[in-house]
């Protein structure tokens, strides 16, 4: 049950009973009515702007309209009190019985509480990470990996059909350079002295095992081949090895994709997929031959002072038209982007989400233009840009590169602080804002460490059940039994905790609609804070303690409340990709 959806329906029902509203119903936009928690909890449990947004089209005063609405709402047995504030806001305080029924519904739903049908029938592709397969993941990839993965989990929880995708950039010139780097390691494995790695090649030792495996399987045969013969063999082996490494890196962060899409498939069979995509745009009138004027600033790689085949992307929102085919007849990298989007659209996705680094900001308009041109505006495209992560240790900056010249890897960070700390902290700031990651801060056991604070709340919930079993021996109560004892929950402090739990479905939907998974991380911290505060009250007020060894019935009722808290924490942490431990060690 979504408290705010429920009361939105009740408020609209009350409005429909007002004569003036019925008379002008066709002129009114009920979609502008907001039902949400009041900014100040002391004002009530639910607030609405209904009178504010409807007064003008109804030709009346907001406060006067609010008084009429309030009179209708007072007839609702679940409304304990209702009042008007300021220019016409309506604040509603709910009856204890409503909170108790809501708690029973939460307990009955368990970890499914908060699931939504918001995205029902909509298919979404979330593409994230998509790092070049040229080496291990570095720390710069962490944030996009976590944001993309958590967003996909969030959308799935909100009812969308979601596929997590990784685009393997395995068709560019950087792959040729990588293959030549591996071939050098292959020669080294055969016993050749290769000396210092030449400038322009990849120097990392992670390529040594790939060269050794080629030497073991092919002996000197590759060495005796010209480059055009050994290149495809070495490329395939190298890309496979790099993707194994990348998948292992991502798995260490609890990131798992459904699809790994190879760019090379777009170039297969004479680049049939790219040709088809360009032909479709041509049919729609978006393709022409021409020469682009030199853009201001640094010239892009695909600019030529010659006639090229161009995408008329300025007609669909881009800053400039984009080359598809160079003057020599070869396809641009952008042409592959067009074909890739068409592939996604043809797979039936209603929305494509790209999670990219902030350095890809210049790609946004061209990708949006591709979406409009390819889908005729039928498919939605969203690009989320992730700002940089800066590493610190006890407040002091940590160099992002090692003495060897290699970057700090994703695996380095995960092995030092754990995947839970990395994931939750990467979500604890909006993706469009820079993030400071302090190794010391994310491992300390304090309120200042969000991941510890939230996980500790779940562990405390589990400890309550252990205490109850110790107090009552064979205590083994099912959620169904918990739900039958909610009448024992009525203290204002307990109801405040229920109210915080009641925000969860709204947070899920709001975060999914805005595609902002950090909202969920913030909410989990707030919920944990509310639970810890209630726990601490029990130290000074014995009547609020979860376990009363002299009152089994009261204990079972409060265990139901703890069960609901634990369920929401577990669900929320699962969406973020973070564990919900039963105890903290």
UniProtKB/Swiss-Prot annotation:
GO CC annotations on file: cytoplasm
EC number: 6.1.1.19
GO BP annotation list: arginyl-tRNA aminoacylation
Pfam families recorded: Arg_tRNA_synt_N, DALR_1, tRNA-synt_1d
Coiled coil location: none
Keyword terms: Aminoacyl-tRNA synthetase, ATP-binding, Cytoplasm, Ligase, Nucleotide-binding, Protein biosynthesis
Top enzyme category: ligase
Superkingdom in the source lineage: Bacteria
UniProt-recorded Gene Ontology molecular function terms: arginine-tRNA ligase activity; ATP binding
Listed PROSITE patterns: AA_TRNA_LIGASE_I
Stored InterPro entries: aa-tRNA-synth_I_CS, Arg-tRNA-ligase, Arg-tRNA-synth_N, Arg-tRNA-synth_N_sf, ArgRS_core, DALR_anticod-bd, Rossmann-like_a/b/a_fold, tRNAsynth_Ia_anticodon-bd
Subcellular location(s) per record: Cytoplasm
Reactions catalysed according to its record: tRNA(Arg) + L-arginine + ATP = L-arginyl-tRNA(Arg) + AMP + diphosphate
Motif, 'HIGH' region: chain positions: 131-141
Family: Belongs to the class-I aminoacyl-tRNA synthetase family.
Oligomeric form and interacting partners: Monomer.
Protein name listed in UniProt: Arginine--tRNA ligase
Organism: Rhizobium leguminosarum bv. trifolii (strain WSM2304)
């Amino acid at each position: 049950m979504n408290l705010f959806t429920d009361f939105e329906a009740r408020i609209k029902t009350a409005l429909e009973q007002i004569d003036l509203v019925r008379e002008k119903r066709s002129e009114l936009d009920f979609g502008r009515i907001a039902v949400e928690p009041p900014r100040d909890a002391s004002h009530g449990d639910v607030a609405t702007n209904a009178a504010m947004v409807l007064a003008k089209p109804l030709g009346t005063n907001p406060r006067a309209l609010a008084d009429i609405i309030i009179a209708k709402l007072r007839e609702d047995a679940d409304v304990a009190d209702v009042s008007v504030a300021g220019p016409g806001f309506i604040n509603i305080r709910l009856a204890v019985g409503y909170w108790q029924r809501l708690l029973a519904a939460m307990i009955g739903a368990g970890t499914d509480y908060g699931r939504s049908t918001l995205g029902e029938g909509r298919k979404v592709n979330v593409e994230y990470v998509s790092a070049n397969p040229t080496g291990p993941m570095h720390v710069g990839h962490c944030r996009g990996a976590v944001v993309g993965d958590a967003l996909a989990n969030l959308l799935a929880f909100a009812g969308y059909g979601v596929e997590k995708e990784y685009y393997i950039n395995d068709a560019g010139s950087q792959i040729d350079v990588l293959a030549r780097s591996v071939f050098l390691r292959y020669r080294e494995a055969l016993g050749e002295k290769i000396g210092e790695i030449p400038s322009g090649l990849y120097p990392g030792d992670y390529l040594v095992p790939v060269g050794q495996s080629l030497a073991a399987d092919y002996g000197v045969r590759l060495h005796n081949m010209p480059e055009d013969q050994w290149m495809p063999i070495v490329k395939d082996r190298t890309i496979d090895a790099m993707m194994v490494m990348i998948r292992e890196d991502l798995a260490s962060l609890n990131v798992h994709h459904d699809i790994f899409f190879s760019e090379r498939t777009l170039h297969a069979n004479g680049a049939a997929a790219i040709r088809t995509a360009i032909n479709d745009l041509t049919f729609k009138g978006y393709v022409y031959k021409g020469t682009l004027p030199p853009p201001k600033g640094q010239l892009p790689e695909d600019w030529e002072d010659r006639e090229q085949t161009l995408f008329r992307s300025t007609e669909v929102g881009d800053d400039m038209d984009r080359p598809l085919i160079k003057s020599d007849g070869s396809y641009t990298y952008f042409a592959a982007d067009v074909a890739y989007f068409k592939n996604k659209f043809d797979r039936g996705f209603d929305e494509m989400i790209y999670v990219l680094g902030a350095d890809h900001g210049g790609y946004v308009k061209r990708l949006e233009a591709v979406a409009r041109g390819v889908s005729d505006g039928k498919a939605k495209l969203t690009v989320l840009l992730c700002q940089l992560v800066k590493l610190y240790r006890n407040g002091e900056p940590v160099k992002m590169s090692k003495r060897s010249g290699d970057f700090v890897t994703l695996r380095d960070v995960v092995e030092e602080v754990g995947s839970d700390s990395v994931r939750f902290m990467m979500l604890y700031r909006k993706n469009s804002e820079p993030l400071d990651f302090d190794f010391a801060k994310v491992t300390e056991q304090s309120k200042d460490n969000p991941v510890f604070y939230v996980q500790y709340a779940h562990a405390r919930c589990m400890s309550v059940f252990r205490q109850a079993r110790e107090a009552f021996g064979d205590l083994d109560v099912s959620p169904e039994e918990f739900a039958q004892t909610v009448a024992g929950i009525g203290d204002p402090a307990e109801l405040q905790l229920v109210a915080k739990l009641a925000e969860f479905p709204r947070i899920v939907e709001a975060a999914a609609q805005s595609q902002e998974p950090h909202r969920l991380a913030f909410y989990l911290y707030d919920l944990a804070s509310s639970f810890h505060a209630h726990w601490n009250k029990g130290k000074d007020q014995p009547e609020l303690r979860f376990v009363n060894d002299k009152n089994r019935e009261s204990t079972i009722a409060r265990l139901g409340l703890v069960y609901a808290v634990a369920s929401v924490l577990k669900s929320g942490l699962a969406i973020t990709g973070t564990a919900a431990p039963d105890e903290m060690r």
